[in-house]
Amino acid sequence: MTPCDGRSPPLGRTTSPFRTRRSSPGSTSETLSADDDRLRFTVTSVTPTFLEATALRRGPLRPRKGLNVVEHPVRLLSLPAHDRAHLDALSGFAGLSFAFSFMLDGSEARWVREVAPGAAVIGKIERAEAVASLADIDARVDATWICRGDLGAQLGMPGLARFVGGLAPRAFGQPMLMAGQVLEHLTSHPEPTRSEVCHLHDLLARGFAGVVLSDETAIGRDPVGAVSAARSLLDSLGG
């Protein structure tokens, strides 16, 4: 869970807010995915201090990449202690927003507001179950992010395309932002591709309130430049 500046579109890095199931020593029941399912592992050995796994889908594991449990549905019963500690430490600051990863139905927003009552809560749509609960989530949060990375890993590429293509952001009560490879070329280059700029224009024309940068700022060569380029494009396109 990452705080965002509530005064502007939250262009920045987010991290998963939970470790849903801690494997007990000797557990080998879980499959893990990393980097939006580009990599996948099966757990072979777990102790209290380390985990060993066999790669099912191999490749380079880049820094600052999420590690997720593949088996779903996974339901959180409460806010994890480490996130509660983060909220406690930041609750006195004004103008903060907190993005809640892998939100299920929006009820999780209450956990954040109990600890940080003045903060805005953003629901990250990253799991198949959230797609069916999108209206409920929208009614309980202050904004939603459509996170195409993890969501695409769950829905599959065609399923993701159909879901995103059918979205009508203006039909929802809260701002909706698009996340996941929106301006990915900025990760390694000073300018986006023409295709990305056209895509950004289409998103704004459809009613999306803005975009969320991920690799562009998390592992990019020039995070500040990426944000500046995105902000300039949003301004010039009327976002």
How would you describe each model-predicted region?
Residues 1-239:
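Non-catalytic helical/linker scaffolds that mediate oligomerization, partner binding
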